[in-house]
Amino acid sequence: MNTVIADFTERAGTGRVLKAEPEAIQLAPEQTALIVVDMQNAYTSIGGYLDLAGFDVSKTKPVVENIQKAVTAAHAAGIQVIYFKNGWDNQYVEAGGAGSPNFHKSNALKTMRKQPELQGKLLAKGGWDFELIDELQPKSQDIVIEKPRYSGFFNTALDSMLRARGIRNLVFVGIATNVCVESTLRDGFFLEYFGVALDDACYQAGPVEMHRASMYNIKTFFGWVSDTQSFVNTFQHNQQLAKTA
C-alpha cells in the first residue's frame, strides 16, 4: 500500500504509519491533534437534542467506547486532544435570528419552535444538553473549544491554536459524521490540514447511509479514513518505542 508522507512530517523524522484508505498516511504525534467532535449529552443521550428531534441515538455506545480508546492512545503518545462543544448562549443570540440560515436549518432550533417547552434547554450553554458526557471528560492538558456552527473553524480560535502548536494533522472522532465532523474536516482541508476520520469512532445524524456517504466523500476528496484499532496500534507502538529508546 502506498503511504502519504507530507514534507513537514518527513523533516520531523518522528512519523508513524497509520493504516488508512485510500492509502496509508504517516503522522508525527507532535504534529497531530485528535479532534473529539460534540460528544455532548445532546448528541449521545436519550432525552438529548438529537433524540428529541427524532434521530436514533441508541447505537452510540460502541462509538463512545472507541473514542475512549482513541483518547487514551492519544494521551499516551503525546497527541493533543481537542474537544468541541456545539451550542449557543441560553438566549440563542449566537444562533442567529431569522436573517440567518442557521435559524431555519438547525434542527435544535426548529424542535424548540415546535415544542416551546424545550426553549432554553437544547444546546444552551450551562445546561445538561450542552455538557460533555461523563465518559469523555477532558484532562488538564486537553483543549475545549465551544463552537456556534457545524464547523469547528468558524468563529473559533481553532486555527490559531493549531498553528501555534505546529499541528498540521487532524484525526476526527465524534458526532455527527455527516454534519460537524465532515464540515470541520472539509474546512481543515481548505486550510491545508491533513484530515483523517476514524470510521468506527464516528456516528451519523440520520440513517447509516449518511455515515457511509461521508466516509466516501472524505477518503475520495478531502482526506483519509482509518479505524480505532489501527490508530491505537500505531500510537501504542510509538509509545513503546519511546520507552525503549
UniProtKB/Swiss-Prot annotation:
It is an enzyme of class 3 (hydrolase). Disulfide bonds: none annotated. The keyword Hydrolase applies. Keywords: Hydrolase. It comes from the Bacteria. Belongs to the isochorismatase family. RutB subfamily. The keyword Transmembrane helix does not apply. Pfam families: Isochorismatase (PF00857). Signal peptide: none annotated. InterPro entries: Isochorismatase-like_dom, Isochorismatase-like_hydrls, Isochorismatase-like_sf, RutB. This is Ureidoacrylate amidohydrolase RutB. GO terms for biological process: nitrogen utilization; uracil catabolic process. It catalyses: (Z)-3-ureidoacrylate + H2O + H(+) = (Z)-3-aminoacrylate + NH4(+) + CO2; (Z)-3-ureidoacrylate + H2O = (Z)-3-aminoacrylate + carbamate + H(+); (Z)-2-methylureidoacrylate + H2O + H(+) = (Z)-2-methylaminoacrylate + NH4(+) + CO2. One of its GO terms (molecular function) is hydrolase activity, acting on carbon-nitrogen (but not peptide) bonds, in linear amides. Hydrolyzes ureidoacrylate to form aminoacrylate and carbamate. The carbamate hydrolyzes spontaneously, thereby releasing one of the nitrogen atoms of the pyrimidine ring as ammonia and one of its carbon atoms as CO2. Its EC number is 3.5.1.110. SUPFAM superfamilies: Isochorismatase-like hydrolases. The active site is at D38 (proton acceptor), K147, C180 (nucleophile).
